[in-house]
Amino acid sequence: EALGLTLTVFIEVALNKKDKETRDSFMERIRLWPEVLECHFISGEYDNLLRIVLEDIVAYRKFVLDKLLAIPEVEKTRSSISLGQWKSTTALPLGSA
């Protein structure tokens, strides 16, 4: 937040094709975007889950309309705006099983 990046959004992205070429093309593009902190390849109705951090809702709107939806491989998206973070850790649960 000290850098003015106060908005965290999780965006599910469905691609219009499920082949490797489509996935690779999508990944090549989003790897270039500093707003995208994480991208997970997921199961279910959507193919990818992005975690992005932005300044505000105006920057979010611009990101979705000018970048994400401009990718031809993107069929649809669904976003969830984080209202707060309850837990964040990099520690692995070693020995907890």
Model regions and ranges:
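A compositional/biophysical signature of low hydrophobicity enriched in polar/charged and small residues
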Residues: 1-97
